[in-house]
């Protein structure tokens, strides 16, 4: 079966639905569409009720003042998110000011801490750090290595992709964990603002840090090879050039080898003819047909696992004579 190469524990559907609405926290941008959030901005009474309940709300930050307070138009009130309440680590000097400035024009989570009706319009005082502290505490307490969660890409660095693991709480996916196929930069695989899935790699309560991985959700060698047939001509991307041949990515977790060609460079899109697929050697042999126009953006990932929990994942096909590529998600 498709799951034979890895052990996956799926959460029962009813529990999953309950978890997603009440127990888990979603990346920023996920809350604005929720009816309860929209309803909170309908009247001052509804906003006060949301304040009393400590409900997570969300709106787009309209501007950042010279003092680095964020301002929001909540319809029935003006929202002010003071600088020290904009993100975890700001008050302590551990978080750079760009983390505040870059919220302008983006959905931002918060709770209401006070409402001043003496102003016109009324002023709602907000806090994002209260939300993030609560979310970070819950994530550190409840997540285990191998848990599959939603995330949103916030920015890309040469060493990896930073993602929002819930209400703006940051996490890192190292470049080596984005896919099995090697890439030059995370932008070869992901785009800023993209919604993705990820698996928890490590949970470090003492450092208040969670690291994630992505490649285990993108399928084993056999699962990816099953998408192709010998004799087909398909599109691929040149990933690396070696003296003995050119590695061409067919999917993020499947590459093949073609004969050397002087006109090829990493990142080029090409069409390739599939000469052979050899599970025993974990090899796909290709012939380059043509160089194609470059891709505008990375292809959205195809996930073979979309929820639940992974105990272990084995990329290498059964009976293959190559070194086994495997991830075992250990509880620290």
Language-model regions: role of each:
Residues 2-74, 95-123, 150, 158, ...:
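OB-fold/S1-family RNA-binding modules
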Residues 32-55, 93-100, 127-145, 184-187, ...:
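Short boundary/loop segments of OB/S1/cold-shock single-stranded nucleic-acid-binding domains
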Residues 78-98, 171-186, 254-264:
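Beta-strand/loop nucleic-acid-binding surfaces
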Residues 132-136, 141-213, 218:
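Solenoidal tandem-repeat scaffolds enriched in leucines and small polar residues
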Residues 134, 171, 220, 256, ...:
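Residue-level signal for secondary-structure boundary sites
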Residues 240-248, 252-259, 268-269:
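Intrinsically disordered, low-complexity segments enriched in Gly and acidic/Ser/Thr residues
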């Amino acid at each position: 079966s498709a799951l034979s190469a890895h052990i996956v524990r799926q959460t029962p559907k009813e529990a999953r639905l309950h978890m997603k609405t009440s127990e888990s926290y979603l990346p920023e941008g996920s809350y604005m569409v929720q009816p309860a959030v929209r309803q909170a901005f309908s009247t001052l009474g509804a906003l006060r009720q949301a304040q009393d309940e400590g409900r997570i709300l969300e709106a787009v930050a309209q501007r950042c003042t010279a003092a680095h307070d964020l301002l929001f138009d909540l319809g029935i009130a003006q929202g002010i998110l003071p600088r020290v309440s904009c993100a975890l680590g700001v008050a302590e000097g551990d978080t750079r000011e760009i983390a505040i400035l870059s919220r302008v024009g983006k959905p931002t989570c918060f709770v209401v801490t006070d409402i001043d009706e003496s102003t016109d319009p009324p002023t709602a005082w907000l806090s994002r750090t209260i939300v993030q502290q609560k979310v970070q505490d819950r994530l550190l307490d409840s997540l285990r290595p191998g848990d599959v969660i939603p995330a949103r890409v916030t920015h890309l660095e040469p060493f990896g992709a930073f993602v929002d693991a819930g209400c703006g709480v940051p996490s890192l996916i190292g470049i080596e964990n984005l896919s099995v196929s090697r890439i030059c930069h995370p932008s070869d695989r992901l785009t800023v603002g993209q919604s993705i899935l990820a698996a928890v790699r490590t949970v470090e309560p003492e450092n208040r840090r969670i690291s994630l991985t992505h490649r285990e959700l993108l399928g084993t060698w056999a699962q990816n090879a099953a998408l192709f047939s010998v004799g087909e001509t398909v599109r691929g991307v040149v990933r690396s050039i070696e003296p003995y041949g050119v590695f061409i990515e067919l999917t993020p977790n499947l590459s093949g080898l073609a004969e050397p060609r002087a006109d090829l460079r990493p990142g080029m899109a090409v069409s390739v003819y599939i000469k052979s697929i050899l599970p025993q050697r974990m090899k796909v042999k290709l012939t380059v047909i043509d160089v194609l126009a470059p891709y505008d953006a990375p292809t959205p990932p195809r996930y073979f696992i979309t929820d639940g929990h992974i105990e272990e994942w084995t990329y290498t096909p059964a009976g293959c004579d190559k070194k086994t590529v495997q991830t075992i998600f250990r509880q620290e």
